[in-house]
Amino acid sequence: MTLWLPATGKVYLPPTPPVARVQSTDDYVERTNVFYHAMSDRLLTVGHPYYDVRSSDGLKIEVPKVSGNQYRAFRVRLPDPNKFALADMSVYNPEKERLVWACAGLEIGRGQPLGVGTTGHPLFNKLRDTENNSNYQGGSRDDRQNTSFDPKQVQMFVVGCVPCMGEHWDKAPVCASEENNQTGQCPPLELKNTVIEDGDMFDIGFGNINNKVLSTNKSDVSLDIVNEICKYPDFLTMANDVYGDACFFFARREQCYARHYFVRGGNVGDAIPDGTVNQDHKYYLPAKSDQQQYLLGNSTYFPTVSGSLVTSDAQLFNRPFWLRRAQGHNNGILWGNQMFITVADNTRNTNFSISVSTDNGEVTEYNSQTLREYLRHVEEYQLSIILQLCKVPLKAEVLTQINAMNSGILEEWQLGFVPTPDNSVHDLYRYINSKATKCPDAVVEKEKEDPFAKYTFWNVDLTEKLSLDLDQYPLGRKFIFQSGLQSRPRIVRSSVKVSKGTKRKRS
């Protein structure tokens, strides 16, 4: 007998209002044939590769930290094209259109020779080498050693019109029921998203983690990251961004291998289960009590990685990149007349060793007690950009999407939506500044807020460095050649015939 039964699952109905669809910038931005070249000055920075050198009272930074393992987050400011005195004013109609910039090409120039820089810690938490052992050795109260290594090799850059989004693992809040039982326990972890700022450290082989909070012994990692948060670009989030402003495109090259294999010192927080769960011998068989192996050694193993060979054959820098199609809906449109270029590169990681004598006289013999050794790291950048002039029509559907994306863009264009009319009656005094009436309301003029003011960037001002003469610059000539904007001059052959020489006949 067949019985009809009601459906036990949920019935999903489509939403009654239409779902908003985000359009690509190619759908409403019209590109012109006007291109500009912009190039920065040589951008130089010098500092200590491991930490800030502070004054004796700790209030002033005398030498900043400049490491090859830091991000360089450039904020490039461009002029407002709507305020340009264009040579051809027929390019656009200011009553019906607004001008914006589009990134057509980019070259990140890097100076200085290739080199490998080492990092380390004078009190590194390394009990011993675990790859080649000749005897079984337990730990003592303090087994830290002076250890150094070369970091993972990283070359990377991310280009967008908003800052690059990073991710790292951090300590998570504890549940209320477990707050009083956390002494000596491993804290819960959560993945956090933060903006990558200039000077943030990238992963050098120990992971993207908040070492400030999660490295209590201050010895598990090297000096340059022991008091820092190591971040990694959140490519998944930026690729799925509905507007695609954070990452038009990126280039990435990472390489490393495990060079040394060590074990940590200290007690193991999560003991091997055999020793705590009724000795069920699933992981090891215990040794006799008179052997050294009876007391298990530490099982917290870790490698120190190496970036290996640094070569000019695998460089992402000092070469042009052309943007034809971005990965998101924003195809290179620079909203707000600004561009964010986030760079990570430690292939030019040489640290200078500078020795200075503490004696005033001439140094005639070596004495380590009268010599001081200093470390310095230098970096050199130059940014070159090809900009394309584009037009945005002031249509209702276009302005609606731009307003939903970023209402500040319409304010910069001196546009705005008319608010709903207020039918209430307001009081308007004639002599409001006289003593006979009440004090006028203090109206504070609202200044335009910078949404990225709280972040640290390397500001690069290109508002007065644009040029239409592309052939006068290296990147401009490359752009002209690859885009076919200028054809080669034809070689006109002469129509005059050259007579052949006559041979003399031998007599």
Curated annotation (Swiss-Prot):
Domain of life: Viruses
Name of the molecule in the record: Major capsid protein L1
One of the GO BP terms on file: endocytosis involved in viral entry into host cell
Compartment(s) where it occurs, according to its Swiss-Prot or TrEMBL record: Virion; Host nucleus
Entry's Gene Ontology cellular component terms: host cell nucleus; T=7 icosahedral viral capsid
Keyword Cytoplasm on entry: no
Alphabetical keyword list: Capsid protein, Disulfide bond, Host nucleus, Host-virus interaction, Late protein, T=7 icosahedral capsid protein, Viral attachment to host cell, Viral penetration into host cytoplasm, Virion, Virus endocytosis by host, Virus entry into host cell
Complexes and interactors: Self-assembles into homopentamers. The capsid has an icosahedral symmetry and consists of 72 capsomers, with each capsomer being a pentamer of L1. Interacts with the minor capsid protein L2; this interaction is necessary for viral genome encapsidation. Interacts with protein E2; this interaction enhances E2-dependent replication and transcription activation.
GO molecular function list: structural molecule activity
Family statement drawn from the similarity comment of this UniProt entry: Belongs to the papillomaviridae L1 protein family.
Function: Forms an icosahedral capsid with a T=7 symmetry and a 50 nm diameter. The capsid is composed of 72 pentamers linked to each other by disulfide bonds and associated with L2 proteins. Binds to heparan sulfate proteoglycans on cell surface of basal layer keratinocytes to provide initial virion attachment. This binding mediates a conformational change in the virus capsid that facilitates efficient infection. The virion enters the host cell via endocytosis. During virus trafficking, L1 protein dissociates from the viral DNA and the genomic DNA is released to the host nucleus.
Pfam families named among the record's database cross-references: Late_protein_L1
